[in-house]
Amino acid sequence: MTTRIDAFRTETTAIDGLHVIRMKQIHDERGTIREFFRASAMTDAGLHPGPWRQLNLTETSHGAVRGLHGEAMTKLVSVVQGSVFGAYVDARPNSPTVGAVVTVEIEVGTQVLVPQGVCNGFQSTSDGVSQYLYCFDEEWRPGMSGVGITPLDPRLAIKWPIPIDAANRGQLSQKDLDAPTLASVLASLGN
C-alpha cells in the first residue's frame, strides 16, 4: 500500500492576521484522511487555536454569493464538499492593512483563518452544491457588532468567477446587495 502525506502548512496573505491553511492529509488506496483541526499545530504556527464555540454549515448553489460579512469573532472557514471562491476584505479601521482584499480558491483540504473584523464572503464554484463550514470563537447573537459590505463594491474590484446578476435573489440576497461600500463603512467608523 502506497501512502502519501501532505503536511500541515500555512500561508500569510496581504491582510494582517488572515492565513490560508493547508490541512494535513494522508492519502492511500482506500482514500484520504484530513486532519481538520489540531490545536497544537495552530499554536505552533502562531495561529488562533480557538476554542470554537459555534459551527455552521451552509449549502450554497452554483454561482450564489454569500457575504461580505465581518463580525466581532474569529472564524476558521473551509469547504467540506465542492469548491468556492473566497473573498476577504479588511474593514478594521485601525488595521495596518485596512482596505486590503484577498481572494482564495478553496477546495476540500484548504481552510482560511479570518480575524475578527475582516469581512468574509464566497461564491460557490461547484457544479452542484458547495458545503462551507464556519467555526466561530464566539456564538452569534442578534445585535452582535460587525459590518457588512456589498460584494458588488466597484472599488474592491473583486473578480467573481461567475457573473453576478444583481436582480437574481437566488444568487445574491437583498441584504448583501443593499449593504454599504467599504468607503461608507470606514466613514461611519470615523476613518
Predicted regions and their residues:
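Conserved metal-binding segment of the jelly-roll/cupin
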Residues: 105-127
